[in-house]
Amino acid sequence: MKSFAACVLLLCALFFEQVFAVRFDIPASTKPEQVCIRDFVSEGQLVLIDIETDGSVGDGQQLNLYVRDSNGNEYRRNRDIAGEVRVVFTAPQSTSFDVCFENVAQVNGRSLSRSIELDIESGSEARDWNKIQASEKLKPVEVELRRIEELTDEIVDEFNYLKGREERLRDTNESTNRRVRNFSIAVIVVLVALGAWQVNYMKNFFRAKHII
């Protein structure tokens, strides 16, 4: 059973490497909206973001870059970028982060845009394995095995995080259901008590008027 689990983790490590690449265009506008790419990173993981754009500074458009996570931490804020840009940071906690761009048109009446190629690597994939191989004098096979081992550990950690998150969400859901049930019971009790009071009040009223 343990060997089967190890095989599953190895396959996951081979097929779900933490590398994300995308290419897209952003048109320039005098009132631009941010275009964001979101990714997830675990606590303590290294994140490497490589950005390559066409165009140049002063070509009538200003491409701005923002890198921030869902907790409000900002890792990079660059204005008027062009060419190649690299962003490196270590995640302080497990969270999602956004790589956002906005393209500001500096000249009216012209249709301009920037092409962006974005590569995001995290965890073991963000490490410089050539440097590690040279410094520790490892064989290529040893480097690959070590990389797969670290990637497998990261997958296990992410599974554990997702499991813990699912448990927290389940606890929250159960707590919400319990509160809704208690509130519903309280509303029913209040309505029954109010109905009984109204019936008693009407009986006393009719008796006072000698109707009954």
Curated annotation (Swiss-Prot):
InterPro entries named among the record's database cross-references: Emp24-like, GOLD_dom
Pfam families reported for this sequence: EMP24_GP25L
Main subcellular location: endoplasmic reticulum
Topological domains annotated Cytoplasmic: 203-212
Sorted UniProt keywords: Endoplasmic reticulum, ER-Golgi transport, Golgi apparatus, Membrane, Protein transport, Signal, Transmembrane, Transmembrane helix, Transport
Keyword Nucleotidyltransferase: no
Membrane topology annotation: Single-pass type I membrane protein
Domain GOLD: 34-122
Function of the protein: Constituent of COPII-coated endoplasmic reticulum-derived transport vesicles. Required for efficient transport of a subset of secretory proteins to the Golgi. Facilitates retrograde transport from the Golgi to the endoplasmic reticulum.
Record family assignment: Belongs to the EMP24/GP25L family.
Protein name (record): Endoplasmic reticulum vesicle protein 25
Organism the protein comes from: Kluyveromyces lactis (strain ATCC 8585 / CBS 2359 / DSM 70799 / NBRC 1267 / NRRL Y-1140 / WM37)
Lineage: Eukaryota, Fungi, Dikarya, Ascomycota, Saccharomycotina
Gene coding for it: ERV25
